[in-house]
Design a protein with these regions (language model features):
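Cyclophilin-like peptidyl-prolyl cis-trans isomerases
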Residues: 1-117
Length: 117
């Protein structure tokens, strides 16, 4: 999490609720391989936007994603957008954050979500 900017989730390797690995959380993968970037310059990265996370290199997207807590026009054309949060964004504003380089001992988790067409 970057306070007041974004919340990141989706580390299926090291971020599982029942098997957290604080040393590597945020660096894991899904085990299914990466996908190519699908950059859409017309997508407005506004508060509530959801996009796939990646390494510094493009075409390395996997299971991790982020949700913006504020507008971020610098992300346009840089990250693969997948949608927008239409309900519940206020809950993400309450996600625990630690100002130090320490992990929150009891992190918050996304237990359920629903994708709408």
């Amino acid at each position: 999490m970057i306070k007041n900017v974004l919340v990141q989730a989706g580390d299926l390797e090291f971020g599982k609720k029942n098997n957290l690995n604080y040393t590597y959380i945020g660096t894991g993968s899904s085990g299914y391989g990466t996908i190519n970037s699908e950059l859409d310059n017309s997508f407005d990265f506004k508060k509530g936007s959801v996009a796939l996370s990646r390494t510094e290199k493009k075409n390395t997207e996997d299971s991790q994603f982020f949700i913006l807590l504020a507008d971020a026009p610098l992300f346009e054309g840089e990250y693969s957008p997948v949608g927008k949060v239409i309900y519940g964004l206020e809950v993400l504003q309450k996600v625990k954050y630690n100002d130090k380089v320490e992990y929150v001992l009891r992190p918050d988790f996304i237990n359920t979500f629903e994708m709408l067409k």
